[in-house]
Every structure is written in C-alpha cells, then in structure tokens.
Amino acid sequence: MTQSNPFQQYGITSGLAAAAAAKASVLAAMGTISDYVGVPTPIGLRIEVKVEMMKQIDARSGIAAVRKFSGDNPDTLNGALFESRAVIRDDGLINIFAGEGIGVAVSDGLPVRRGDPAINPVARMMIENAVREVSGSAGFDVYISVPGGEDLARDTMNPRVGISGGISILGTTGIEEPVSGPDYEAHIEYLLQTGRCVSTVAVMCPGNTAMRFAESYLRLHPASFILTGDRIGSAIEMAIEKGYREIVVFGLPGKLVKMAAGVMNTHSRIADARFETIAAYAALNGADRDTISKILSSNTVESAFAVLRSIGLLDSVAGAIASRIVERLRSPVWQIRRILLRHDRFRRQAIRVSPVAGHIETGE
C-alpha cells in the first residue's frame, strides 16, 4: 500500500501479519493453497497479504507463514516471519495459542492479564475474524509463532513495559503508518498506560538518540521513557490525561526548537520554522542583519548554533528559546504544573532548562 506521496509506503502491523498467517494456515488445513490471503481490518479495509509459505500437513492440519512488511516505518519487526499452524476441531471453537517468539505479560496494568500471551485484544480479534472468514462450521486450534522473536524483542519496548520472552502482537488498525500516525499514538498511549503503573514521571523522547542519552542521564524507571516520534504534543496530552505528575521533554535541538514556535507535531511535512525561530530570538538578543542571514541560510540547527556561538550569543538565544518552550508547555492548553525540559548533545553541547524560570546552561 502506498500513500498519496509515492515515496512513503504503509506497512502491516504485527496483528495483521499474525491474522494473515492464521487464515492461510486454516486454508491450508482445508486443502486450499494460495499466494495471497485477504484479511479484514477494524477500520473496514481489506488487506491482501502475500503468503511466504503454505502447506497442508494432513487432512486435519496445515501450516503457513507471512513476512511482516513495515513500509517506511523504522520497525524492529520488519521482515520478521510470522508462522501459524492450524488444527481442525470438531466443536466449532476457535482457540488462539502463542508459540515460539511471542512474549508473555509479567506485569499488571497491561492490555492482557499477567501470565497471558502478549496478543493484544484488537490483534486477537483480527486473528479470530480472519479465521472465521474461511472456517465455516469447523473449529480450529491456531498456534502462532515468530522464530527469533525473543531476540527481536530485546530491541523493542517490551522489556521495559513488562513483556518477557518475545514480541507483542499489536495493532489497532492493522495498518502501520510510515510516520508517527494514529496507530503509533495508540502505541504511545499503551506505553503511558503501562508506565503509569510504576512511575509518575514521563520522559518524552522524539528519537532513539535522545532516548538512549535520556536513559543514561536520568535515574528513572525504564518504563518512564517514552519514544514519541514526531507526536510530542499528543504524547504530552495523553500523559496529562493519565495523571503523570511530571513531564520531561528530552531531545535534540532540531525537534525542540520547533516547539518554541508552537509546533507540537515535529514531522517536517507538518511544519518547520526552526531557523526562523532561531533567527527571531537572535534578533531579539541583538544579532545584526548579517548574523540573521547566516542563520536563515543554515542547513542544520547545529550550524545555526555555531553562528551564534562565534559571536557569543548562543547562551542567551538558547536560553530564550528554552524559556519559550517551557512557556508554551505551561499554557492553559496543556495544563501542566511542572515542566523540565532538557537537551543534551553528548560532549559537544549541553542545554539544561530548569522548571522554574527556563534557566539554561550551555557548555562544551
């Protein structure tokens, strides 16, 4: 599937991949072999999914496999093989079992009960609906597995949120968007819901680099750290709704500067305003026309900061921008009582903003 922008591709969620594999294995058990299976989604669309392998084992069972495709979304599970084995039952019941590579809930507060397989309710519904499309009056035991899933899960949020031993089968729409869209927002909400069980602090990190550095910098429970992608504003709103007492925004300047301009979805397709924002605050702090021109001609925020550093204005401009971000996030729209905003660029430059007055420290 392709967005209106031909360079951006949608993918399928782990829930849809599992549903496609399950349906294919049921068809195989019934003696029908096909290269593709159609799977219904909760949003009313039907998705045709390519079947990697499909085989009837005997008159009562079949196996099939589907390879997950994540489109342009950076996803640990892209290319992972979802396998399913279906065995006919005589009582008409459809039972879904988790096999190799599927995690188990080991914490409370998750969408599934402690001790149950990490197959979320909507994903389980998708699997059952896909199977029932072709099962007729027959029942089936369906066993889903992801070879190597335990290793893949180490690079996901599962160890943080209380899923052990493998991946989760997720998805609210069946469709994986290439940027932080509604399906990813559901994932953020899931992380915030589970994190709230163990922490009152939510650390919003727009990217993996910020996430890794935040984890090394802040002494907090692992579930406190939320990878928001571009949906920082939505993540903050959800954290407020879920009763977090403190929200930390921790990221690199390319994302954070946009927030000073009120841009809370930081994807470049939505808005930019980085250099205009830096230039405006540089002008307010005494920068001349030549400096403003250099900032507006910069290719990166770091290069714009270098211009300011060369004339001794970096601290004052960065402080003003940081104060404005804090002001934005403290507005009645957000209703946040306390904000701690941090930016750190490892050893090159560090900016830290206090929650009291937007005080800023910069240094090499």
UniProtKB/Swiss-Prot annotation:
Coiled coil: none annotated. The keyword Cell membrane does not apply. Gene3D superfamilies: CbiD-like. InterPro entries: CbiD, CbiD_sf. It comes from the Archaea. Pathway: Cofactor biosynthesis; adenosylcobalamin biosynthesis; cob(II)yrinate a,c-diamide from sirohydrochlorin (anaerobic route): step 6/10. GO terms for biological process: anaerobic cobalamin biosynthetic process; methylation. Its EC number is 2.1.1.195. One of its GO terms (molecular function) is cobalt-precorrin-5B C1-methyltransferase activity. Keywords: Cobalamin biosynthesis, Methyltransferase, S-adenosyl-L-methionine, Transferase. It holds the Pfam family CbiD. Belongs to the CbiD family. NCBIfam families: cbiD. This is Cobalt-precorrin-5B C(1)-methyltransferase. It comes from Thermoplasma acidophilum (strain ATCC 25905 / DSM 1728 / JCM 9062 / NBRC 15155 / AMRC-C165). The gene is cbiD.
